[in-house]
Amino acid sequence: MIVKKLTLPKDFLWGGAVAAHQVEGGWNKGGKGPSICDVLTGGAHGVPREITKEVLPGKYYPNHEAVDFYGHYKEDIKLFAEMGFKCFRTSIAWTRIFPKGDEAQPNEEGLKFYDDMFDELLKYNIEPVITLSHFEMPLHLVQQYGSWTNRKVVDFFVRFAEVVFERYKHKVKYWMTFNEINNQRNWRAPLFGYCCSGVVYTEHENPEETMYQVLHHQFVASALAVKAARRINPEMKVGCMLAMVPLYPYSCNPDDVMFAQESMRERYVFTDVQLRGYYPSYVLNEWERRGFNIKMEDGDLDVLREGTCDYLGFSYYMTNAVKAEGGTGDAISGFEGSVPNPYVKASDWGWQIDPVGLRYALCELYERYQRPLFIVENGFGAYDKVEEDGSINDDYRIDYLRAHIEEMKKAVTYDGVDLMGYTPWGCIDCVSFTTGQYSKRYGFIYVNKHDDGTGDMSRSRKKSFNWYKEVIASNGEKL
């Protein structure tokens, strides 16, 4: 019997991913207004980033300068093209387009910047993959409107979406609405809730009820944006985006199995609504059981049904094991009941390294939704050492990515998952979202910038640069 070797599709989208606030810098250039990430201080592993009410003198805000993609984008895109990128995921900084968020007219200088950047990508046949909201909400909307707790913000977001859809309708095909929207489930950790929504949930009398009200507004905004995109250009594809951390039961104890299932369901509600178009019974039962009053307007449920997303983008970095009783993790970490998994290793930041978990995640998501999937974040944050000759031998990053790509290929060629592409996170070094560090590096491209703010921003290729170039050229066959 002849066994045919299956490969990834020829149109598979290989590339890399970043977010505007982590790479662009130029926080007050070109008419840009302050966003919620512009008031996040630097931090470190074990030292949380501080959220300030405004930009304060004497505080260090690494996102203000980031790695100056705003001034280096042509140089950086040329390097992406050298690697052979088929696509590049980034976000449009909302406050470059609407500096306060509630203006009637957009900022033309901001629109022109993205025109130029997209043109530069398309010059090299690199498809832009664009997130509308990647932790970049206008600070003014937080201060004056209470952020997404206020229904008016739905209209402001939809106006922003319509403006950029119309402006870039012939330049950008792939969009996503909200980045890692489900990280609000970690509402006890202020950073996650704040960056996803502009809300510090712990300041509210009933944090979880507030979270669900915020989410309803975001779900409606996402659905209205999807409907607008289809009206403006039916060829555009709009996805939702999930932070996918599969939770394994620590044992076959039925209590552990049930606890893992319930914990995953708390995260799936975000994509259940955006992909299926309705609130699942398990969350409606929770609201009734706990006496939550989620305010909805007439027609909202119709909007959710009519504005389902075209595909599911997700990030994958790790798995966690959980148990019903005796877990060492806490609710603040977002993984209540978690315990160390003895079968996998961990990174310097404690993230469990589990390549097989990526295949598991792909199968779980595809079987649940039967929609195209897109791995829009996956990567290995590490301290990189620059040798005396200038080389950076990041074999650990190559090993991590190789193992994950191998499992990704199995999901496509064995399991039949419909996978659009793969964009490793931080393809160029950037400011870490969770810690505000430069030293937590992910990139194929090294940026000479350091946690104390020093460095000349020069770019250089790591060993992984040429490795990934060969991976793309061989469509994943040469690992």
From Swiss-Prot:
It comes from Escherichia coli (strain K12). PROSITE patterns: GLYCOSYL_HYDROL_F1_1 (PS00572), GLYCOSYL_HYDROL_F1_2 (PS00653). It catalyses: 6-phospho-beta-D-glucosyl-(1->4)-D-glucose + H2O = D-glucose 6-phosphate + D-glucose. Gene3D superfamilies: Glycosidases (3.20.20.80). Catalyzes the hydrolysis of phosphorylated beta-glucosides into glucose-6-phosphate (G-6-P) and aglycone. It has a high affinity for phosphorylated aromatic beta-glucosides (p-nitrophenyl-beta-glucoside, phenyl beta-glucoside, arbutin), with the exception of phosphorylated salicin, and a low affinity for phosphorylated beta-methyl-glucoside. Apparently, it has only a very limited role in the utilization of external beta-glucosides. GO terms for cellular component: cytosol. One of its GO terms (molecular function) is glucosidase activity. This is 6-phospho-beta-glucosidase BglA. Its EC number is 3.2.1.86. The keyword Transcription regulation does not apply. Belongs to the glycosyl hydrolase 1 family. Induction: Constitutively expressed. GO terms for biological process: carbohydrate catabolic process. It comes from the Bacteria. Keywords: Glycosidase, Hydrolase. The active site is at E180, E377. Signal peptide: none annotated. Homotetramer.
